[in-house]
């Protein structure tokens, strides 16, 4: 089942990820906590209406543009037939179709030296759809549906046929020290495995720490149920800071931690760090290691390697 859950996450990211995520990854990993970021397109498809943009991570691309109506396209994986986004007014849609043909097995006789054996793999068919809408008095709503026909496919995925449903809601909600609420629900129903349900509820707020420095604090609750096994997580916490280092460079740090009430344990704090560079015509976002802070001058001026693990180049107009 762990393979199934990981596969679904990969498909949602690889099949319908239409925008830069490096900034969000460095700030805790949840795009919904940063409504102004283009990474929201993958959570709330209606966010495509806020941008004309083109970006790449060195392997894939995404571009969307338009005036009253937006259209966006991305390359996706080698077996993706189409990855499309659309937006108009307060609505948005992401659609992905993945089709990989069946490979028939070839078996060779022991005395046939010219024959090349081929391992047979079953065909793959994945339909991945997201719809989003901003509703007055309710907030931002995103709905996700995925239907797949997938089995062991060589070095790709090992995943049974099944269906995934998801719902995300974000709204302004003044409560205690927080300004916004985020609720998400996800249900994974593979044909031959136990269903998996995930439920999360978070409160978050942004902090004006100083000039050109913004912080985020989020706290929430999570519940996961897999067959007869359930796990309650509370509290889940995210703390992140983004600060202008110079007039063209931004430094980012994000920390997450969740406590399992069911197992009375935690994996501890998970840190992430990143940099953003504004080159005028485009923006470069990258994830970096914590050693950025041990020798910042040489790192930012290029005299020492940044040890960047991934990047995004984004152009907006």
Indicate residue ranges for each PLM-predicted region.
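N-terminal, post-signal peptide beta-strand-biased segments of exported outer-membrane/organellar beta-barrel
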Residues: 17-76
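Outer-membrane beta-barrel architecture
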Residues: 62-64, 83-87, 128-134, 164-170, ...
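Sequence/structural signature of outer-membrane beta-barrel proteins
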Residues: 76-78, 100-108, 146-157, 184-194, ...
């Amino acid at each position: 089942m762990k393979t199934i859950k990981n596969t679904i996450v990969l498909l949602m990211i690889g099949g319908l990820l239409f925008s830069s995520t490096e900034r969000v990854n460095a700030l805790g990993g949840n795009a919904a906590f940063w409504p102004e970021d283009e990474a929201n397109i993958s959570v709330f498809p209606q966010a495509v209406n806020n941008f004309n943009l083109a970006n790449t991570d060195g392997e894939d691309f995404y571009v969307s543009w338009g005036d009253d109506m937006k259209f966006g396209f991305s390359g996706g994986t080698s077996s993706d037939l189409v990855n499309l986004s659309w937006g108009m007014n307060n609505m948005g849609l992401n659609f992905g179709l993945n089709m990989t043909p069946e490979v028939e097995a070839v078996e060779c006789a022991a005395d046939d030296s010219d024959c090349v054996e081929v391992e047979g793999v079953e065909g793959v068919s994945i339909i991945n759809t997201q719809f989003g809408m901003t509703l007055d008095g309710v907030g931002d709503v995103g709905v996700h549906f995925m239907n797949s026909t997938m089995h062991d496919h060589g070095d790709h995925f090992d995943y049974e046929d099944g269906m995934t449903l998801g719902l995300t809601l974000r709204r302004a909600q003044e409560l205690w020290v927080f300004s916004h609420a985020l609720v998400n629900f996800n249900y994974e129903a593979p044909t031959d495995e136990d269903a998996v349900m995930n439920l999360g509820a978070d409160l978050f707020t942004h902090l004006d720490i100083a000039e050109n420095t913004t912080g985020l604090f989020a706290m929430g609750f999570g519940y996961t149920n897999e067959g007869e096994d359930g796990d309650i997580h509370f509290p889940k916490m995210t703390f992140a800071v983004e600060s202008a280092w110079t007039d063209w460079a931004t430094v980012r740090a994000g920390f997450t931690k969740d406590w399992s009430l069911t197992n009375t344990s935690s994996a501890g704090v998970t840190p992430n760090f990143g940099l953003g560079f504004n080159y005028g015509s485009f923006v470069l976002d990258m994830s970096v290691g914590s050693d950025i802070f041990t020798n910042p001058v040489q790192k930012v001026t290029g005299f020492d390697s940044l040890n960047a693990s991934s990047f995004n180049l984004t152009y907006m107009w």
